[in-house]
């Protein structure tokens, strides 16, 4: 899979229409574009009627080949907003090999002033668009857009979804034959269910025959404007085979949409928000006096992407999560809650320099840029020991502000001083107890308390590890305010938030005491010297008394493979019995349903990447729970799945 981003190369004609250089074709007709969209895609998929017939909590899923300027999406959203009942949702999934730059998208949107109420919200979030899955939450969560950036034949096989209606809107088959292949139509069939509809402007014979062969019943219908005929289709083939049972979707929960989330840090707050936006009434149980009191409580955390040049599942998760978090931060107050000041990772030795060279070759400059020594100093505003890799869209975040913002939804109720000691399942309800007192109950519960999820028997065998980390708070000086970006080596230092810089962070695998220590403050000052002796001088570090420094310590919670643990939870003993045959033959996939603990989910193990992976993991939990398209590639969802560890133990005979 390509990790290089290629934007659409566009020329604008004398009527203001965008014209693709890559495909030598126009994106839409200047006078008939919206009318064509309504006729070809809205009418052929009966969306007026289907939107009006939705019930509260129903979600209609549209799939599209070729996002282009987004016109089809905006027209569908406008109609959904007009016709759908309150509480219904629209989920729009689209693939685009050459996304428009933000400037080109804004220019195209000016051609449709009647759609401004829908184009502007997307434009405000149109940041950090990089290869892979990029999810947008719009209209208070009523509308979800999942853009898959890349070649359709690379992206669609990774999608886990059930599509209700298809918009086939690549450029004309003669101009863009790769978008009209039997292999692609096989993917459309895999993602469809019996009754899924399809609309397309092309009536080319081989396209029609290939769609019929894939399982669609196709019919030519009268067109509009210069298009004499268009096509309407219905999927009449068989439903796709389900995933391996240990990664299959749990059955829908009966009863009211009520949920408990245990823990109000980054993972819990994100999960609560994602469920609340889908109509769940969420009670967040937090043992402390307020949210973000543990690892999520640092004054500044860094939006830092530790990527691989080889497109690993972790790298894909980071890239998708980074984009989702950046779009969320657009709602917060820049300078106080976060700052997109960029992140500079120094090339502090030859090995790191070689790693950075590979990354610079693998990714687009909009994501990361290799800077020489003098360039790095110009970006940072201080003297440095080396150049490095600059992430212009990165920066720092005040994690408690993000948690508070995510909890600020009318469907979320925060219950502080509620420590859950035990979970009991009674009559389809998960009951949260603090000993003798019943705190709350609901059909769905999400454990989001970092390593403390292991106190519950269902998660006791998850291999979570706590790593103590301490940050140091340094008073800003007039000279230190020259620092313009986060700078990282083995540690990191951020530009000041208010009157303080944050410096960190130590790694201690053996200490369980959260009292800040002088030794670790001294260690952090040593990390600062490695980053920049100039900044250490500007901060007056030589005169600072380490015993008087302020800071805080907390536990990172990580897994052995450094991926978070996100998804539905199974009964481990029953799992081991049900799939015992895997110890003898790991290749077989028995047709035996997974013994889920219905309604129990976990969101943990984010390590030092919580700002990047936790918000998107909230969306992943909600997608599992609501039967929606997964916001990450299927392989990434499986790599994050709680069952991966029990599966490995069975296969390895441990």
From Swiss-Prot:
Short name of one Pfam family: DAO
Catalytic activity from the UniProt record: 5-aminomethyl-2-thiouridine(34) in tRNA + S-adenosyl-L-methionine = 5-methylaminomethyl-2-thiouridine(34) in tRNA + S-adenosyl-L-homocysteine + H(+)
Compartments it resides in: Cytoplasm
GO cellular component: cytoplasm
Region (FAD-dependent cmnm(5)s(2)U34 oxidoreductase): 262-654
Superkingdom, taxonomy of origin: Bacteria
InterPro entries attached to this UniProt entry: FAD-dep_OxRdtase, FAD/NAD-bd_sf, MnmC-like_methylTransf, SAM-dependent_MTases_sf, tRNA_MAMT_biosynth_bifunc_MnmC, tRNA_MNMC2, tRNA_S-uridine_synth_MnmC_C
Enzyme Commission designation: 2.1.1.61, 1.5.-.-
A Gene Ontology molecular function term of the record: tRNA (5-methylaminomethyl-2-thiouridylate)(34)-methyltransferase activity
Keyword check for Cytoplasm: yes
Membrane spanning residue stretches: none
Region (tRNA (mnm(5)s(2)U34)-methyltransferase): 1-236
Keyword field: Cytoplasm, FAD, Flavoprotein, Methyltransferase, Multifunctional enzyme, Oxidoreductase, S-adenosyl-L-methionine, Transferase, tRNA processing
Keyword Cytoplasm tagged: yes
Cofactor(s) demanded: FAD
Gene3D superfamilies per UniProt: D-Amino Acid Oxidase, subunit A, domain 2 (3.30.9.10), FAD/NAD(P)-binding domain (3.50.50.60), Vaccinia Virus protein VP39 (3.40.50.150)
Gene Ontology BP, a term: methylation
Function, in words: Catalyzes the last two steps in the biosynthesis of 5-methylaminomethyl-2-thiouridine (mnm(5)s(2)U) at the wobble position (U34) in tRNA. Catalyzes the FAD-dependent demodification of cmnm(5)s(2)U34 to nm(5)s(2)U34, followed by the transfer of a methyl group from S-adenosyl-L-methionine to nm(5)s(2)U34, to form mnm(5)s(2)U34.
Stored PANTHER family: SARCOSINE DEHYDROGENASE-RELATED, TRNA 5-METHYLAMINOMETHYL-2-THIOURIDINE BIOSYNTHESIS BIFUNCTIONAL PROTEIN MNMC
HAMAP family registered for this protein in UniProt: MnmC
Family: In the N-terminal section; belongs to the methyltransferase superfamily. tRNA (mnm(5)s(2)U34)-methyltransferase family.
Protein name: tRNA 5-methylaminomethyl-2-thiouridine biosynthesis bifunctional protein MnmC
